[in-house]
From Swiss-Prot:
This is Homeobox protein Hox-D13. Pfam families: Homeodomain, HoxA13_N. It comes from the Eukaryota. Sequence-specific transcription factor that binds gene promoters and activates their transcription. Part of a developmental regulatory system that provides cells with specific positional identities on the anterior-posterior axis. Belongs to the Abd-B homeobox family. The gene is HOXD13. It is found in: Nucleus. Disulfide bonds: none annotated. One of its GO terms (molecular function) is DNA-binding transcription factor activity, RNA polymerase II-specific.
Length: 301
């Protein structure tokens, strides 16, 4: 095993350091499984991923593996650090790695159908497939990740404005991005019965949006007024006086065009009318006399 390590550090490693190339090999475990592990380590080194040896180690040979490191070539410049993050879609967990000027690469890792990560079922995470449609620079990934994690109860840090709902608009790499806030003042949230953790808002006071319908006809009922039934006060239907009532009123008017309180009470009792009706009739009768007199003057002139 030391010979293999020496070969990898001497000639086969190229420009890499011995410690870096040695990290691709697991702890020495002698037996038939050594050849398979060496082949798996070589395949992992060729693909760019570190290989960690599996199985139980016993005795003095068991020791923790050092962290895996890449072996860059002698002539190749150092690669830009890849920025990665993960998101949940459907029944799988997708890990995304992104470099400067390179599009998102997705690696679908299978998960149990009813897996729950962070207290939320994976079926309830929002779709961020629109992020992978175009090439996005690496400096925008952190902001895009914050924009994606706008679910209720999600632990990722993002600035939240109280009393507003975050409506995130996602654009391409060359288009500006902005966040739109919809005011939800006076609204209370309620959760759906099927267990969805999103928020749906309904009006707290439904009477604010209702308008009062006013009729142009007198005596109609005001409609669309919740929790109240108010009759609009208007003119009552005109009830003509009887001949006996009119005769009694005309006789009193012939005696005196103006009535006092005692005379009004007496006429009200005799005609079965209210005192207000008697007073109004005398007022209208005086106006009628003035119109008649004015017409006579016009005819004479």
């Amino acid at each position: 095993m030391d010979g293999l390590r020496g070969d990898s550090s001497g000639g086969g490693g190229g420009g890499g350091t011995p410690g870096q190339c040695r990290n691709f090999l697991s702890s020495p475990v002698f037996g038939a499984a050594h050849t398979g592990r060496a082949a798996a380590a070589a395949a992992a080194a060729a693909s760019g991923f570190a290989y960690a040896g599996g199985g139980e180690r016993s005795g003095a040979a068991a020791r923790p593996d050092p962290p895996a490191k890449d072996c860059p070539g002698s002539g190749a410049p150092p690669a830009a650090p890849a920025l990665g993050y993960g998101y949940h879609f459907g029944n799988g967990y997708y890990s995304c790695r992104m470099s400067n000027g390179v599009g998102i690469q997705q690696n679908a890792l299978k998960s149990p159908p009813h897996a729950s990560i962070g207290g939320f079922p994976v079926e309830k995470y929002m779709d961020v497939s629109s992020l992978t449609s175009t090439s996005v620079p690496a400096n925008e990934v952190s902001t895009r990740a914050k924009e994606v994690s706008s679910y209720q109860g999600y632990t990722n840090p993002y600035q939240h404005v109280p009393g507003y709902i975050d409506m995130v608009s996602t654009f391409g790499s060359g288009e500006p991005r902005h966040e739109t806030y919809i005011s939800m003042e006076g609204y209370q949230s309620w959760t759906l019965a099927n267990g969805w953790n999103g928020q749906v808002y309904c009006a707290k006071d439904q009477t604010q949006s209702s308008h009062f319908w006013k009729s142009s006809f007198p005596g109609d009922v005001a409609l669309n007024q919740p929790e109240m039934c108010v009759y609009r006060r208007g003119r009552k239907k005109r009830v003509p006086y009887t001949k006996l009532q009119l005769k009694e009123l005309e006789n009193e008017y012939a005696i005196n065009k103006f009535i006092n309180k005692d005379k009004r009470r007496r006429i009200s009792a005799a005609t079965n009318l209210s005192e207000r009706q008697v007073t109004i009739w005398f007022q209208n009768r005086r106006v009628k006399d003035k119109k008649i007199v004015s017409k006579l003057k016009d005819n004479v002139s």
